[in-house]
Amino acid sequence: MISANEFAKSTVLMSTSLPGIAGIFIAVPYFRLRPRWLTVVSLGIISLFFFDAALKGFLRDYFGLRPNPTLVLHAIFNTNPDETNEFFLHNWRKLAEAGGILLFVGAWIFWFEKCMSFREARLPLNTLRRSGFASIGVLLTAFLALHFNPTMAKENPALFWPIRYMDYRNQLKQAQELRQTVARNMAQRSEWKVQYTGPANNTVVWIIGESTNRSNMSLYGYGRRTTPMLDALRNQLIVFQDVISSEPATMSSLMKMFTPADLVSPDAWNSKPDVLMLAEEAGYKTFWISNQVPNDGWLGLVSERADEKLFINKGAGRGENNFDGNLLPGLEAALANPASKKLIVVHLLGAHPTYDMRYPSSYAKFNDVDDAIAEQLSAAGRSIWIRQLRNEYDNAIAYNDFVVASMIKSTMASAPGAASLLFSADHGQEVGHTRDHAGQSVADPSGYEIPMLLWTRSFSGKSAVDKAILENRPYQTDHLEHTIMGLLKVESRYYSSSRDIMSDAFVSEDFSNGLRRINGRPYLPRTVTFNQPLAKAGS
């Protein structure tokens, strides 16, 4: 719901503006009988404030914070009509509840306004004139004076949303300026100090998952067998146990995964080269294979730099039933490319809501099951709606298991030589893990706790102890570009081995002692089994 602070600011603004503006016309004799347009204006002002409060409240409930930060702006404005339609499909119950309450309040306001109109019509004219002007002047003066306070001025709904949209457009403008800046600075690439230190042939596949929570994978101990294919490959994989995303939303997370930007310097993506640029400078042929529609913002700038691009999703973006398995031929073609050094980025739709659109019907394995997970959710007081979404989410995880495992097998079967495949998700997902909610979550650890796993030929033959040490290193993905550059064997002024999770020089202590943060607070790994929902409050 809307915060007390926001509610107080909106109430003050509405309390001073509405009576002041509407009261002018009540007090003036000419408007003794209120005209219809004045009623429309009065109701419009009231509706604007209440709709603004309702929208902010919904966004706070959905994202866990008010719609100021970059991640919410991207989620609101960086979308297309079909993705918007999918959002409504996924959240129609909550939206229906909010809409019903808003309609009820609106009807009550309309009735109250009519009652006030009849009451005013019966009051003596002189009473209106004498008592009206002074109070109206005070209210209007207070309303205007409040706008000298920048914080209060920005809470005016007539300004709040236009300002937010202008902020978003400015970010897009910065991205366009970045393209121009990069073009101008081509001659300055020597300052990057790029050096390739690897073998003659090297292939790195980077699979980027979407909205994937590791606590829903049997590979990480989940009570449902959602990842049987990855489970079978377990001995050949390095499965990192304590990795979190830097952000709970796609765009802001990817900005920090692909560039030197991190939680300390979030704007570094504006001025420093991304992974693809550094790889190409080192002589790599780059591929971008995606089941997400081409992006016209920052991510579009990155993907368009790839030497070869394949976007199989030509329809409704995240609202398209185009399954990630359809990316496999594109990956196999890239693996067969004769280039000696290849970086192949594969961007999945993963488990992004709407969950039941992420898998074919043959993977609807957990629909209506009555198992220990269902009992845990029920005991924790999760609604039947959330329990159903958890089943659909687990189906999506099961299909994601097939996709990722198949890509690992394809990479394993590729031409001999150095080869690695890293799978990491952009962010997690809350699906009844800690509360009765399904979707992105800024405040809950479930929005950040992601899987990360690696297959690499260079690690074969290492001891179980070495593997266990690696798997238990704490990490956050705003430093993931260092690990990618390590796999690529590319050194530069932007690479730090202390942030490369595979490096012998990796400094675990930094990540254990406050470097990792979620929602502005230090992240503390949970000491309870994180794949079980919390108990009911008071139980």
Language model feature labels by segment:
Residues 207, 421-423:
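Residue-level marker for buried hydrophobic side chains located in beta-strands
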Residues 192-195, 436-443:
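Short, P/G- and charge-enriched loop/turn segments at secondary-structure junctions
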Residues 138-206, 211-375, 449, 477, ...:
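Active-site-proximal alpha/beta segments of enzymes that process anionic O-linked groups
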Residues 1-160:
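Transmembrane and membrane-interface helices of multi-pass
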Residues 446-453:
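Acyl/amide activation-and-transfer machinery of modular secondary-metabolite enzymes
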Residues 426:
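Active-site glycine-centered loops adjacent to acidic/histidine catalytic or metal-binding residues
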Residues 329-332, 370-421, 454, 479:
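A long, amphipathic alpha-helix that forms part
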Residues 7, 11, 30-33, 113-118, ...:
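Membrane-interface soluble catalytic domains
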